[in-house]
Amino acid sequence: MAQKLITFAVPCYNSAAYMRHCIETLLSAGEQAEIILVDDGSTKDDTPAICDEYAAKYPTIVKAIHQENGGHGEGVNQGIRNATGLYYKVVDSDDWLDEAALRTVLAKLNTLTARGTAPDLMICNYVYEHVEDNPSHTVRYTNVFPQNRLFNWTHVGHFRPDQNLLMHSVMYRTQVLRDCGMVLPKHTFYVDNIFVYQPLPFVKSMYYMDLDLYRYFIGRADQSVNESVMVKRVDQQLRVTRHMIDCQDLDALKGQKKLRSYMLHYLSMMMAISDIFLLLDGSAAAKQKENELWAYLKAHTSAGVYRSIRYGFGGVTNLKIPKGDKLVLGGYRLAQKIFKFN
């Protein structure tokens, strides 16, 4: 049997209210796709039964995997372990893909694969779909990447603060994910940051299509990117940030200037996000955690990497000046209004 072009992994946890819409959009890819529905120990609704229903109805496309609760990261790990597709994409069960854009992307991947030029990373736009006031905001990369051709990091332009690669914008070759040895931590939110960071040094070729493929549903009260939820789960944000500090030696990338610069920028952003949510907590314990995180960065990276982050973007949120915390939070609120990120 011919290899599937792409594996979609859909981690599902008590997702019965919205997962069908997600799955139906993925089914539009037809037989060239494999859809792995990972039921992450759901107990409160019909998620397990819905997974089994689709697996029975589409046996050549859909696999249902039931696991003990391990969190979103273990759902992604489970998908990688079981994937048979050439490419791998994670789609959260409350999100969906634009079907017309998906057909266009898969047609291009088929063409490139037939030529023997399949890229390690396919990149597309993603769209924030806000539940409260229904505006949408598209994140595109037309100023960062060449369009509709193969390229590498030497061809990459400048990323604006709102243009980081996220899980929503990427399709990795499955083998890249296996080669980099990435295993996401269990019972931890925000591991999507590891997913788009750790494999990057293993990516040798990329392709960007200016298509609004991924629709990112944002604004549910229980969502992990909800601000109050992030404050409560800040320890998980810190765990992910430490993992990212440890998983790559950025000094080993000095021969790849643009890749190293981007990864420094991304790690700086993770430090800044951690600082902001510790500031929002405002407790003495949170301040101690902030100091410990910066000490961890200093102890586990070179002096050059530490200085780049401490005195660059990451350090902006750790100002050692009077009323520095208020300035940081004011800047965060302004950015929140501009970029509508949670």
Spans of features found by a protein language model:
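Donor-binding/catalytic cores of nucleotide-activated saccharide
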Residues: 72, 95-206, 214, 218-230
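Membrane-interface aromatic/basic loop that binds lipid-linked glycans or pyrophosphate carriers
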Residues: 279-342
